[in-house]
Structures are given as structure tokens and as C-alpha cells.
């Protein structure tokens, strides 16, 4: 696609201003005007296929079927987490239910839906009653910037000093969203044998509020892991790459993912993986990762202990690297 875009003679961009805060898109009274703009764009550019890159994005227009007469409409869905976990996500925003379900109605009339895992496809069939033949799986893939690199001794020293990493470490890239299960991971880490906690640190790499950091540090103390859990907060792309390469193990026991990029990013950087036995993670991880039940802290502990003291991590990594080849952009 990138090669096509570089060489295509008729490639151009058009931008439409829908007012401050996209207010034209939020008021139904303006939709006749928006529809005229869309139909003119399709006609003037002789569009055959219209692709919605992210239909649930808050700035995405709520398109109407009648605007696309004679045009094939395709959309990519990355997950349906808010719909599957309504009790958790809908209360966060006053109009979340209306907003989300109006976009589901929009997807009902598009011609074809692309999803990034078989798990998402099955979720849409089960929870939204979509026809299987309307959904095609096109896997997610790892960005080429994630790779094994030599880390100079001075660079490693600087990174370790910046983030307070003194020992071998387990890396987790996630977020404060409870679905990412950082609290479960911290509890599981704290339940490991003392000798393993003395040997390894748990390094949580993601942007967090100070309130979230304080909460995780408090939990670490309560979980008998005081001083062994580090929250880096925001890191640059370069720092993330170095941390992946330096880590002994990636732990990503998320409760649900549409794909699970940290799994393939870790493999690409030469780091073995522990992840969940649910959703897309079991599809992606397969036999190339230690799989755990993310809802069972004791099973996460079991997986950590297995990975750190019982498993041949090099053999596990090689299986992961073999699986990684199907998740590269040149393949998908």
C-alpha cells in the first residue's frame, strides 16, 4: 500500500472543516449538509470503494447508507470492548451508549467489515449478530521499528539509572484501564517466591496519572513487593525499544484484547512472553508464550514462576519468533 501511495498519479488528500469540535457532526440538523459534502466528494472523485479506518473513533462521521449509492463501503473494527463490557465503559460518558450503538447500526449496512483477529470476528457474530460472511480477518502486525538491537553498555546504564532498574526485569506495557490487569499482575508478582522477587523487578511501562502510580505502589507494598515494582510513566519510542531488548520476560496478562501488540513487539525484540489464554491473545501467543488465566492471580503467579525458573525461555522464544512471521505486514 505504501509503495502504491508513493507511485499513484491520482492520489490526493481532501480535508473538510466541520466546525470547532466537529460540531456539525454532533447535531442531526446539519446532516443534510454533511451528506451533500460526502456525496459530492464521492462523485467528483469517482470513488468505487470507501474505507472507514476507525468507525468507533469519536471524530468519525456517522455516515448514512443513502449517501453511498453505487459505492462499496468497507470498515475496520479493532475490537468491541465497550459493547462487551457495557457496565464498565458506558457509565464513563453520558452519551456513550447512544454514541456506540449508533455506530453499530452504521456497521450493519456497510458491505464488508475487516477485523484484526478471529476473536473479534467471533465476538461480533456472538454479541452483535453479524453474519460471518460479512466479516474478514486481516491480522494486525508488528511495526518494523521493533527489532533486536545491540544496546551499548553506556546506554543500558543510562536507561537503568533513569528508571531505577537495578536487576533483571519483567516488562509490562499496558495502562491504567482495569482491563489491562496491572493490579492482578502486581499481586501475582508479589506472590512469587522471595528468591525470585529478589532476582527480578517488575517494570510497568506506560503513561499513568500520579494517582494511578500511587495506587500501584500502594498495592505493591500490600502485595509483599515493596521496592520491586517500577512505573516508568511515559517513555520515548527509543526507550521502549531498549527496554524491550533488555527485559528478561514480557508479562501481558490482559483480560481482553482485540489483537495484542505487546506480544508480537516483544518477540520482535527477542523477549519471551507470558500472556493470557483468552480473546485474541491465545490466538497470537499460541505455543510461543506461557499462557495464564488473567482472572486468576494464582495462575498468573504460576505462569511467572514457570517462565522464570522452569521453562526453557530460549526454546519458547524461538517458537514465538516462528509465530511472529505470520504477523508481519508483508504477510498480512
Where are these predicted regions, by residue range?
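Carbohydrate transferase catalytic cores enriched for Leloir-type hexosyltransferases
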Residues: 1-332
Amino acid at each position: 500500500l505504501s509503495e502504491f501511495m508513493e507511485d499513484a498519479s491520482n492520489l490526493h488528500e481532501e480535508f473538510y472543516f466541520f466546525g470547532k469540535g466537529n460540531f456539525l457532526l454532533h447535531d442531526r440538523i446539519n446532516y443534510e449538509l454533511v451528506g451533500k459534502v460526502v456525496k459530492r466528494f464521492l462523485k467528483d472523485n469517482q470513488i468505487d470503494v470507501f474505507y472507514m479506518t476507525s468507525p468507533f473513533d469519536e471524530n468519525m462521521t456517522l455516515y448514512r447508507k443513502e449517501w453511498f449509492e453505487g459505492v462499496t463501503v468497507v470498515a475496520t473494527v479493532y475490537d468491541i470492548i465497550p459493547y462487551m463490557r457495557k457496565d464498565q465503559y458506558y457509565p464513563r460518558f453520558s452519551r456513550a451508549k447512544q454514541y456506540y450503538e449508533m455506530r453499530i447500526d452504521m456497521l450493519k449496512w456497510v458491505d464488508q467489515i475487516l477485523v484484526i483477529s478471529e476473536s473479534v470476528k467471533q465476538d461480533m457474530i456472538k454479541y452483535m449478530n453479524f453474519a460471518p460472511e460479512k466479516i474478514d480477518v486481516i491480522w494486525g502486525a508488528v511495526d518494523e521499528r521493533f527489532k533486536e538491537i545491540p544496546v551499548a553498555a553506556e546506554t543500558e546504564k543510562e536507561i537503568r539509572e533513569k528508571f531505577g532498574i537495578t536487576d533483571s526485569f519483567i516488562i509490562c506495557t499496558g495502562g491504567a484501564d482495569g482491563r489491562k490487569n496491572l493490579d492482578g499482575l502486581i499481586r501475582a508478582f508479589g506472590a512469587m517466591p522471595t528468591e525470585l522477587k529478589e532476582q527480578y523487578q517488575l517494570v510497568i511501562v506506560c503513561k499513568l496519572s500520579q494517582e494511578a502510580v500511587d495506587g500501584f505502589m500502594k498495592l505493591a507494598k500490600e502485595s509483599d513487593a515493596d521496592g520491586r515494582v517500577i512505573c516508568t510513566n511515559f517513555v520515548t519510542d527509543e526507550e521502549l525499544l531498549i527496554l524491550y531488548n533488555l527485559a528478561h520476560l514480557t508479562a501481558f496478562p490482559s483480560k481482553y484484547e482485540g489483537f495484542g501488540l505487546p506480544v508480537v513487539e516483544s518477540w520482535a525484540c527477542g523477549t519471551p512472553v507470558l500472556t493470557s489464554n483468552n480473546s485474541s491473545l491465545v490466538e497470537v501467543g499460541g505455543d510461543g508464550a506461557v499462557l495464564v488465566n488473567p482472572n486468576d492471580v494464582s495462575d498468573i503467579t504460576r505462569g511467572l514462576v514457570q517462565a522464570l525458573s522452569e521453562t526453557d525461555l530460549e526454546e519458547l522464544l524461538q517458537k514465538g519468533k516462528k509465530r511472529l512471521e505470520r504477523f508481519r505486514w508483508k504477510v498480512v
